[in-house]
Amino acid sequence: MVNGDLRIQYYDEELNIRKVIEQADLEHLDQALNICDLSSLERKLRLWHKLMPRIEPHYAVKCNDDPVVVKFLADLGTGFDCASKNELKLVLGLGVSPERIIFAHPCRPASHLRYAKEQQVVNGTVDNEYEIYKLRKHYPDSNLIVRFKSEAKKALCPLGDKYGCDAEADAAALMLLAKALGLKVTGTSFHVGSGCSEVEAYDRAIEKAENIFKVGEMIGHKMELLDVGGGFPGIDDEMFEEIAQSVNTSVELRFPDKRIRIISEPGRFFVEAAYTLICKVHAKREVRSKDGKLDTMMYYLNDGIFGAFAGMFYYPEEVAPELYLDEAESLPKLKSVIWGPSCDAMDKISDLLLPNLNPGDLLGFRNMGAYTMPIASPFNGFDVPETRFFKAK
């Protein structure tokens, strides 16, 4: 049980970041520190069940694959979206049954398919004829979930250029091919894009899914699973409520038969808000104009875009660090740049206004739980952040 995990520290009412920092002995810690509030995951799951009780969440492991996080969600009863052999190993190794897993990658290496077969992970996505032939050879008893393209007009990371067949031009042909080869198509899936901010995107996709279900049944497949993918926001609960209402309405209209199982692949929804990253200023320098006037303050932190900020390569955003200084808000602000620790000039986190800081001062960055640590690297020999876990008693 998670409650027996010695890596988790417990707090009474509310996690006090300042108190954690005071007790963390950061003066002697070279790398940055992640503070993960696991109770945030519990709150998110309660919100999910409240707003979308029919939709089974299958956590997207790629979003944050820390074993403590994955184990915590497993103990709460979520399913899992895995995309590789190693992700399957992680989840299965924690005691999760194969029935709670969808192998949600349309283009998998043959060795990964053979491993899924050995472990009886039967549900997996497909979006092209080559993958169907591969499945006939390596895992003919699997359940094929046809993934189609249906993108949001607003998303942080669109996925349609890489994955998803055309719902009208390709889906029927793929299901016919599967039938001819003696394979089972049991459902369909889509992904509107990571970090979706267009409510209507899900209804458009679910309408396409309804048509694919009808065609699949006509071909002779037993269609029984709809996967509505991911894209659910991690820090905008108001947006999530709007999306949930849209999904519920569309599902009830187009899939009223409760025997049809409906799952999803939320990632950032669960973990984005759970993490706060604490960085330390380890060096500073002043940039002055030719006449000697101070122009810019440069601060060098112990983490950067090769670490937990790596996602900024893909979707740059403004950062708003919290300062753990007395009366920080009242201090005069200076034009500043915060850099990561590496030698690479691309390792720049942000231009912003900050009070005068000194080596040893700390900056906190909230909402750092999604697509951060899995893509962080120790480039230039700088360690990736350490993570410490907390939970309400």
Swiss-Prot record:
It comes from the Eukaryota. The keyword Lyase applies. Keywords: Decarboxylase, Lyase, Polyamine biosynthesis, Pyridoxal phosphate. Pyridoxal 5'-phosphate binds at S194, G231, E265, P266, G267, R268, Y371. Inhibited by antizyme (AZ) in response to polyamine levels. AZ inhibits the assembly of the functional homodimer by binding to ODC monomers and targeting them for ubiquitin-independent proteolytic destruction by the 26S proteasome. The record marks H191 as: Stacks against the aromatic ring of pyridoxal phosphate and stabilizes reaction intermediates. The keyword Lyase applies. CDD domains: PLPDE_III_ODC. One of its GO terms (biological process) is putrescine biosynthetic process from arginine, via ornithine. Pathway: Amine and polyamine biosynthesis; putrescine biosynthesis via L-ornithine pathway; putrescine from L-ornithine: step 1/1. Substrate binds at Y314, Y315, D344. The modification N6-(pyridoxal phosphate)lysine is found at K62. GO terms for cellular component: cytoplasm. InterPro entries: Ala_racemase/Decarboxylase_C, De-COase2_C, De-COase2_N, De-COase2_pyr-phos_BS, Orn/DAP/Arg_de-COase, Orn_de-COase, PLP-binding_barrel. Belongs to the Orn/Lys/Arg decarboxylase class-II family. Catalyzes the first and rate-limiting step of polyamine biosynthesis that converts ornithine into putrescine, which is the precursor for the polyamines, spermidine and spermine. Polyamines are essential for cell proliferation and are implicated in cellular processes, ranging from DNA replication to apoptosis. Homodimer. Only the dimer is catalytically active, as the active sites are constructed of residues from both monomers. This is Ornithine decarboxylase 2. It comes from Drosophila melanogaster (Fruit fly). The lineage of its organism: Eukaryota, Metazoa, Ecdysozoa, Arthropoda, Hexapoda. The gene is Odc2.
